């Protein structure tokens, strides 16, 4: 039996183990800010298997880091550690970080009672991202079952607070945890993504002059001014899409570039001209832009296109989520190695940029590491009331990861 066949058999032999672990993880209501119990369980579970795992507390000083994302209602990091698992190599190989997160978005009570039917696991976090955690552990367990010892070090990171902006991964990086490459696991549908689009939230406000509507000529409606400002944002969206056409690895139609106005509020009384209007939303962009340039370009358009009143009284700023786009060169050895591994298990694979953002950008920009995003599961099901994942996809993803680790880290005793 060749290595590929032996690996496939080792992964398949642990299918029930992986299913049961995923169902157990889903049972924890680990919404952002409440990850403590699942992290404690995971650290204990790994130690019971003989994997060297430890809690890594998040220092409260992380809130002062320039890359920190403010979290509404933040109550501190006490009792909410990251969990780090170090698999020491024999020496002489390249190292890698494997990262995913255990926090989930909220859901109704029933979503935290995992259901397994016909090879599909249902529940909150099934694909985003507790199924990713299981994928990492399944790959490492299968290699150990085969008696494979890698030459390079592997560090598996199971982090908190990804859904709120990536502060768990930021804390790991701030602590100096680096490697020769990083693979961040998210539900990419088994697609290999060495690039991600970026996303940034914004706040646009404009002051008016509030008066009784019977004296409307003496006032200025902030809402009317906001209508014009939103039109400027949509024209900027068209400009940004045009500037991004043909960018390698991303589709033109539908374009992943979006300016979304998600919430608007204005005024406080039906018969009064509103004295302030506020719009909040998000901008999705490709690696041909960064967040600072987006902010500068929108401000310049407001200065050039808005009414005289809005030019003086409007304010646009990026606020909250600020995920930069990133792009690891397709020819980088880590990308080539992972691409080969994926094709050996899954068949022909096209390298693409992922049309979502995640912690991968921190490993690339902050850590300076070649970074790949990969994993089983459908992004369209993440955060949904029908969140689910196919066990077959978890097995395939684990086989891809194990194949990559053997190639990238090298194996002790290999001729």
Report each predicted region and the residues it spans.
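Short, P/G- and charge-enriched loop/turn segments at secondary-structure junctions
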Residues: 68-75, 190-191, 247-249
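Metal-dependent amide/peptide-bond hydrolase catalytic core
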Residues: 1-6, 48, 77, 203-415
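Acidic/histidine-rich catalytic neighborhood of metal-dependent amide-processing enzymes
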Residues: 129-201, 251, 409-415
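Acidic/His- and Gly-rich active-site-bordering loop/insert found
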Residues: 2-122, 150, 368, 378
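Acidic-glycine-rich active-site phosphate/pyrophosphate-binding loop
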Residues: 103-117, 194-205, 340, 372
């Amino acid at each position: 039996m060749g290595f590929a066949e032996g690996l496939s058999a080792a992964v398949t032999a642990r299918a029930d183990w992986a299913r049961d672990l995923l169902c157990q993880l889903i049972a924890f209501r680990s919404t952002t800010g409440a990850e403590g119990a699942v992290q404690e369980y995971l650290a204990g579970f790994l130690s019971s298997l003989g994997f060297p795992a430890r809690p890594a507390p998040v220092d409260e000083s992380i809130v002062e880091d320039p890359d920190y994302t403010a979290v509404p209602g933040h109550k501190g990091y006490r009792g909410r550690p990251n969990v780090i698992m170090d698999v020491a190599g024999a020496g002489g190989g390249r190292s890698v970080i494997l990262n995913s997160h255990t926090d989930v978005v909220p859901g109704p009570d029933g979503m935290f009672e995992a259901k397994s039917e016909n090879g599909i696991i249902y529940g909150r976090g099934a694909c985003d991202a507790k199924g990713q955690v299981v994928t990492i552990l399944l790959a490492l367990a299968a290699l150990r079952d085969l008696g494979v010892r890698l030459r390079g070090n592997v560090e598996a990171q199971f982090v908190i607070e990804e859904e709120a902006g990536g502060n768990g991964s930021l804390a790991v990086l701030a602590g100096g945890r680096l490697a020769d490459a990083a693979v961040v696991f998210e539900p990419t549908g088994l697609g290999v993504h060495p690039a991600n689009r970026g996303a940034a939230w914004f706040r646009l406000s404009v002051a008016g002059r509030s008066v009784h509507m019977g004296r409307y000529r003496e006032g200025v409606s902030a809402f009317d001014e906001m209508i014009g400002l939103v039109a400027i944002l949509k024209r900027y969206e068209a400009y940004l899409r045009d500037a991004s056409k043909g960018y390698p690895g991303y589709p033109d139609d539908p374009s992943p570039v979006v300016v979304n106005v998600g919430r608007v509020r204005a005024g406080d009384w039906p018969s009064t001209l509103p004295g302030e209007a506020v719009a909040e939303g998000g901008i999705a962009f490709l690696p041909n832009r960064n967040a600072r340039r987006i902010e500068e370009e929108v401000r310049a358009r407001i200065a050039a296109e808005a009414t005289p009143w809005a030019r003086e009284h409007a304010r646009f700023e990026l606020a909250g989520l600020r995920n930069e786009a990133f792009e690891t060169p397709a020819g980088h050895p880590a990308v080539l190695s992972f691409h080969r591994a994926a094709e050996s298990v899954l068949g022909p694979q096209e390298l693409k940029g992922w049309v979502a953002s995640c912690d991968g950008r921190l490993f690339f920009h902050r850590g300076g590491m070649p970074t790949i995003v990969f994993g089983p599961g459908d992004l369209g099901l993440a955060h949904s009331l029908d969140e689910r994942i196919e066990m077959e996809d978890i097995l395939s993803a684990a086989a891809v990861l194990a194949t990559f680790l053997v190639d990238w880290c090298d194996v002790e005793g290999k001729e």
